[in-house]
């Protein structure tokens, strides 16, 4: 089964009305290989609706966070139904900044992932280890623990993309080598085969996130288990276009 390449741009808490206009104009006017590469941007909440209205339709728009309840007294949270109502069809869950800064547990991330899927969103579920965990040779144990938490609550994996993002390589300028990324991605695929079945594992997209930029993205293409990228800072710049078009660089 051919897995469609996936490139996501996580804008984090960056951007202004003016800069978003520039970013959207660039996406709309640049020839991007969106037919072969599923391309999704994740702006701040403030700009979700205007982005969806203004960016071309073959580019997806997603939220950076979602809650695990339909509605109610949950000040500051995103409702999956409200996102869908606004034309937003993707969300991130479990980003390392949510796990570390906001203390989101594996179980909470799994609950949010489950609920978002049930409401009809496509979920990019983020997993990854800290530098201390990598140095203690705990990388695989950590990502398997995080994956098991999701698998305990989710049966249908057809609308999940797994983003492996080593925490030590996010916003630091450090990047896992393509070989390091492939090693973990292969272990994720092996886990999926054993836990979810061979056909689910073969169709599951596992993308890499961690200081990906226009200069290093092509190096990852030679590895079969790397199905795309979750891009941070570079997604705010024109080089994001090169990452989307990585196959023709």
Curated annotation (Swiss-Prot):
Pathway(s) where this gene product acts: Carbohydrate biosynthesis; gluconeogenesis; Carbohydrate degradation; glycolysis; D-glyceraldehyde 3-phosphate from glycerone phosphate: step 1/1
Protein name (record): Triosephosphate isomerase
Record gene name: tpi1
Modified residues (Phosphoserine): 105, 199
Record bears the keyword Cytoplasm: no
PROSITE patterns assigned to the protein according to its UniProt record, in alphabetical order: TIM_1, TIM_2
SUPFAM superfamilies linked: Triosephosphate isomerase (TIM)
Record-level GO BP terms: canonical glycolysis; gluconeogenesis; glyceraldehyde-3-phosphate biosynthetic process; glycerol catabolic process; glycolytic process
Catalytic activity: D-glyceraldehyde 3-phosphate = dihydroxyacetone phosphate
Family the entry assigns: Belongs to the triosephosphate isomerase family.
Residue sites binding substrate per the record: 10, 12
CDD domains found in the cross-reference section: TIM
Quaternary structure and interacting proteins, as annotated: Homodimer.
One Gene Ontology term, aspect cellular component: cytosol
Enzyme Commission designation: 5.3.1.1
Pfam families the record matches: TIM
Location of the active site: 95, 165
Gene Ontology MF, one: triose-phosphate isomerase activity
């Amino acid at each position: 089964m051919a897995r469609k390449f996936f490139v996501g741009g996580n804008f984090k808490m960056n951007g202004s009305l003016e800069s978003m206009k520039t970013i959207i104009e660039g996406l709309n006017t640049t020839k991007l290989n969106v037919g072969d590469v599923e391309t999704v941007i994740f702006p701040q909440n403030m700009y979700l609706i205007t982005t969806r209205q203004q960016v071309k339709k073959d580019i997806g728009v997603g939220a950076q966070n979602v809650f695990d309840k339909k509605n109610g007294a949950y000040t500051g949270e995103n409702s999956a139904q409200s996102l869908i109502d606004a034309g937003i069809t993707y969300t991130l869950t479990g980003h390392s900044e949510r796990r570390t800064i906001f203390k989101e547990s594996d179980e909470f991330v799994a609950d949010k992932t489950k609920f978002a899927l049930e409401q009809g969103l496509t979920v990019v579920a983020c997993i990854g280890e800290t530098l201390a965990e990598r140095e203690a040779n705990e990388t695989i144990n950590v990502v398997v623990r995080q994956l098991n938490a999701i698998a305990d609550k989710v049966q249908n994996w057809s609308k999940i993309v797994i983003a492996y993002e080593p925490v030590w390589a996010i916003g630091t300028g450090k990047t896992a080598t393509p070989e390091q990324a492939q090693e973990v991605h292969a272990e994720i695929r092996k886990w999926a085969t054993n836990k979810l079945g061979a056909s689910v594992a073969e169709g599951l997209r596992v993308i890499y996130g961690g200081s990906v930029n226009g200069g290093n993205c092509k190096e990852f293409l030679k590895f079969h288990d790397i199905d795309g990228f979750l891009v941070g800072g570079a997604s705010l710049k024109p080089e994001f276009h090169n990452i989307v078009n990585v196959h023709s660089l």
